[in-house]
């Protein structure tokens, strides 16, 4: 779980010099807003919105995921999602979605004074209700950081019975891999699977004359290495030079016949990733574009 690095005051817009309005009656100073990461902005928004509610509810879904510090993939939802056990149907108001539902024993916790669904309940809600790619991004994250166990998630999902989204959630839990080191790698893995590309080995290590190097993806049958490049990975010129030497050493290995690099733009675009991977020598068995909501085995 992450917290804001420093205290950010939410006030009425008229009290601020250069306000960024969060919603009616709530704003923060622009420099403070611009200093926050996307996740910190989402957390701040949830806290401010919840503070404006007239009745106590339990923060849920993507709003709870923000409080837990979980990554996401789907377009940012700036509405506050809560469970209101008094309702018999979901109600959508100005910036707030009040869901029906019940909170079982152990499914309610308090984060920074805000009633929130437990981590397990939050992850299962995301896995059932968001896109398959979003589900895998979150599941890879919680498995990697040992926040939850696959067996526990599978058991908790089974206990829910035949609820909406249970098949997608089960497929996402089975597909998740703790070795994925970033949301970009998780998204890449899902997109590659939907293109019919064989499952890669993750974080495979190679011994080269320049030393031992670990790669993001390795397809041994095709002899192809795949690397997801984050936007900030090579800002340091020295890091860029080191990476060039690393890639040269890997390309010279006899078992390596292709090398593919891509960014988040390609990772999230089936057609673009298909072009990158096929040019490196990987067989693309399904035509792009393909819906990111399709599940493994479908």
Model-derived features: positions:
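Short gly/ser-rich loop at a beta-strand->alpha-helix junction or flexible surface loop bordering the NTP-binding
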Residues: 1-165, 201, 281-298
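Surface segments flanking catalytic/ligand-binding clefts of nucleic-acid enzymes
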Residues: 1-9, 14, 143-298
């Amino acid at each position: 779980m992450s917290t804001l690095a420093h205290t950010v005051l939410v006030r009425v817009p008229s009290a601020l010099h250069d306000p960024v309005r969060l919603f009616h009656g709530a704003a923060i100073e622009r420099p403070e807003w611009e200093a926050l990461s996307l996740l910190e902005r989402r957390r701040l928004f949830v806290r401010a919105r919840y503070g404006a509610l007239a009745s106590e509810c339990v923060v849920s879904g993507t709003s709870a995921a923000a409080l837990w510090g979980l990554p996401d993939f789907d377009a940012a939802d700036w509405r506050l999602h809560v469970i209101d056990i008094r309702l018999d149907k979901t109600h959508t108001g100005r910036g707030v979605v009040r869901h029906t539902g019940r909170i079982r024993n152990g499914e309610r916790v308090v984060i920074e004074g805000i009633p929130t669904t437990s981590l397990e309940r939050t992850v299962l809600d995301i896995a059932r209700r968001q896109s398959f790619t979003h589900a895998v991004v979150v599941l890879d994250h919680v498995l990697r950081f040992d926040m939850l166990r696959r067996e526990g998630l599978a058991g908790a999902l089974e206990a829910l019975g035949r609820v909406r989204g249970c098949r997608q959630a089960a497929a996402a839990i089975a597909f998740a891999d703790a070795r994925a080191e970033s949301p970009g790698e998780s998204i890449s893995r899902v997109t590659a699977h939907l293109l019919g590309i064989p499952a890669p080995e993750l974080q495979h290590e190679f011994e080269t004359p320049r030393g031992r190097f670990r790669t993001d993806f390795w397809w041994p049958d095709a002899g192809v290495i795949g690397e997801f490049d984050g936007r900030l990975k090579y800002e340091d010129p020295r890091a860029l030079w080191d990476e060039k030497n690393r890639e040269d050493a890997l390309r010279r290995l006899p078992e390596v016949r292709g090398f593919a690099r891509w960014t988040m733009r390609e990772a999230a675009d089936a057609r673009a990733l298909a072009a990158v991977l096929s040019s490196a020598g990987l067989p693309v068995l399904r035509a792009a574009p393909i819906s990111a909501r399709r599940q493994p085995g479908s």
